[in-house]
Each structure stands twice: as structure tokens, then as C-alpha cells.
Amino acid sequence: MDDILEVRSLTKRFQGLLAIDHVSFALQRNEILGLIGPNGAGKTTMISLISGTLEPSEGEVIFEGVSIRRLPAYRRGRLGIARTFQVMRPFPDLTVLDNVAVGALFGATGHSQVLQDARERAQRWLEFVGLDRRAQQRAESLGGPDRKRLELAKALAMRPKVLLLDEVMAGLNHVEIEEVITVIKKVRDQGISILVIEHVMKAIQSLSDRLLVLRNGEKIAEGRPQEVLSNEQVIAAYLGTKRHE
């Protein structure tokens, strides 16, 4: 087993609220790990702790065998951890191309890039996600589905080893969801390990090698999708009651 990322007893408190409660798991190289759970379970908080946008109260985040708990988000990006955000805030006055170039400039090896090189890399990732036709438009002109593609392209331009995806399929129709699934699988084929939060259960089931389930900040299940989704605790978490014989 070759783990690229490990979370050890990670805990986050917001004053009196225990948002993440001593959660441990590992993401293997070239794996897609689905992170699911009801609203308020702590999923986005978890990837914020991994990416460095939040600081843990306790526990460790280990990346390629080294603790990164005390590193700020930009240093984690330099190492090769990138994420998308559930609430998309592109730079509205920049073109779509230059939004993605920002990711290229501030990701792994980005500090040595010149703008033209970053734009060339950005163009390749726009083609990868199917957004190259809008490269010269201002980002503020994009609709919801295309903003999600932009978020993904910007994260990929950082040259990540680990990609954290936060509900990139929310609000999409069936055809758009299938397109995003195809893109995510192509990302994994590039050798990138992926932790993905998603509420579209059919999509997450077909995408993921394994599932991790949170409820009220606690890990309640982990394993292959079929066994996890038949777990009594998982059923209770989503339905609000245990299934009786």
C-alpha cells in the first residue's frame, strides 16, 4: 500500500463546536477516494484542513511521509496539493485563460514560471476540461457549469499530486455530470490522486475506488463503495433512522 496523503486523528473545534472528531484515513497514490456524508458532516472542513485554509486543533496531515500541519496553504500548493471550492469566486476582470494561468503561477514549480509559459499551460488545461472555446472571455461571463470547469482547470494548472474536489457536480444536469466524471477519470489517468466530495450518489459510486463517510465530524465507515453504501450506520446517517429487520 503506497499512501501519498495520511490524516492522523485530525480534529477541528470552532469554539464549542467539534466539527472534526479525531478522524484518520489515508489516500493512496493514483486513487479516487470519495468523501460523503449528510450536510454538516464536516466534509468541506476536512479538505480545508488538508489544504491549509483551516488550521487543525489536533492531529497531523502527512504528505509524502512528512508532516505539513504547520505549513500555510500556499506552501502546500507548492508541494503539490490543489483544491476546488464549493463557492466559486473566479477573478471576474481576468479572462478565463488568465484565471487558469494564476493557478499555473502559484502551484508546484510555479514560482519559476514566466507569464507566457503559465498561459501556455493554462491553455492546455482549458482544452482538457473542454473550456478552451471561452479562453478569451472574462470569467464573470461564465455560467455555473463552466465556472466549475474553470475551477477544475485552475487547480489542475497547479500541477498537483493530490487534488481535492468539493462538489464539482453540484447543480449540473445528467449530461454535464457524465462529462465531469469522464474528466475526473482522465485526471486520475495523469497519475493524480483525488479526494472528492460529492452528493450525487450514483456519480460518486461509479467514480470512487473507496468511500469514506463522515457524520457529525466522525468517521463512521470506510471501504469499497458497495459495502459502505449497505452499511447500517451509513443508511441511518442519510435516512435519519436505522433500518429494522
Q: What spans do the regions from the language model cover?
A:
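A short, surface-exposed alpha-helical micro-motif characterized by mixed small hydrophobic
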Residues: 204-206
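Conserved ABC nucleotide-binding domain
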Residues: 69-70, 125-146
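Conserved ABC ATPase "signature" region
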Residues: 115-134, 161, 182-185
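Catalytic Walker B motif of ABC-type/P-loop ATPase nucleotide-binding domains
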Residues: 163-167
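Conserved ABC transporter NBD signature motif
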Residues: 59-66, 79
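The feature captures the beta-strand-to-loop junction immediately N-terminal to the Walker
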Residues: 36-38
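Helix-to-loop junction immediately C-terminal to a conserved catalytic motif
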Residues: 51
